[in-house]
Amino acid sequence: MNLLIMGLPGAGKGTQAAKIVEQFHVAHISTGDMFRAAMANQTEMGVLAKSYIDKGELVPDEVTNGIVKERLSQDDIKETGFLLDGYPRTIEQAHALDKTLAELGIELEGVINIEVNPDSLLERLSGRIIHRVTGETFHKVFNPPVDYKEEDYYQREDDKPETVKRRLDVNIAQGEPIIAHYRAKGLVHDIEGNQDINDVFSDIEKVLTNLK
């Protein structure tokens, strides 16, 4: 089975990816792992990626696409299939992936799209607060401290609502054309992500069992 998993930050994509890999024994291909492996093994694309990262520069699309192609060319993929997680991030990368899969003779069989309302993601992602003295982490809504006094807690810049909203807006703008691209191919399976983790996986499991 050859799959993509998509969803906004905080939608539970990583959790569900781990469950899919465990249940269906496909190779989990996450962007971060792929980059680390390519650099550690000093592949042609890995060496190139490292040269950009060492200079603090963004890795260009063609290098990222090359690293994905290197990974998808490996023997285990033919045996197990794959779950791509964190790629493609742009419509240009989606077109590059189409080309790579065609060249390798691999067919993409499904795109799992975990849908969660952006407003509830904003609440989920921007609620984290940290105690100034103890460093303990709490959540304003889901795990509030018993003796909450606003002055005793702070938020990291990354967790502030305006920062989170910007991040979500960017992800929505980049993700929508990708979903539309795969929807036109009849590959997208929308999964309601605003429910218990196990219920989300149960819905995914039904979809994937029918694909097998």
UniProtKB/Swiss-Prot annotation:
Q: Which GO terms describe its molecular function?
A: adenylate kinase activity; ATP binding
Q: What is its EC number?
A: 2.7.4.3
Q: Where do the segments described as LID lie?
A: 127-159
Broadest EC class? Answer: transferase
User: Which pathway does the database say it acts in?
Assistant: Purine metabolism; AMP biosynthesis via salvage pathway; AMP from ADP: step 1/1
Q: Keywords assigned by UniProt?
A: ATP-binding, Cytoplasm, Kinase, Nucleotide biosynthesis, Nucleotide-binding, Transferase
Q: Any idea which positions bind AMP?
A: 31, 36, 57-59, 86-89, 93, 156, 167
Identify the GO cellular component terms for this protein.
cytoplasm
State its location(s). Answer: Cytoplasm
Cytoplasm is among the record's keywords: yes
Q: Name one Pfam family in it.
A: ADK
Q: Kindly list the positions annotated as binding ATP.
A: 10-15, 128, 137-138, 195
| Catalyzed reactions | AMP + ATP = 2 ADP
According to its UniProt entry, the protein's GO biological process terms are: AMP salvage
Keyword Transferase tagged:
yes
- Ranges for the region named NMP are 30-59
Main localization, broad class: cytoplasm
Quoted from the entry, the domain comment is:
Consists of three domains, a large central CORE domain and two small peripheral domains, NMPbind and LID, which undergo movements during catalysis. The LID domain closes over the site of phosphoryl transfer upon ATP binding. Assembling and dissambling the active center during each catalytic cycle provides an effective means to prevent ATP hydrolysis.
Q: What does this protein do?
A: Catalyzes the reversible transfer of the terminal phosphate group between ATP and AMP. Plays an important role in cellular energy homeostasis and in adenine nucleotide metabolism.
Q: How does it assemble?
A: Monomer.
Per the similarity annotation, which family is this? Belongs to the adenylate kinase family.
Protein name per Swiss-Prot or TrEMBL = Adenylate kinase
Organism this protein belongs to: Streptococcus pneumoniae serotype 4 (strain ATCC BAA-334 / TIGR4)
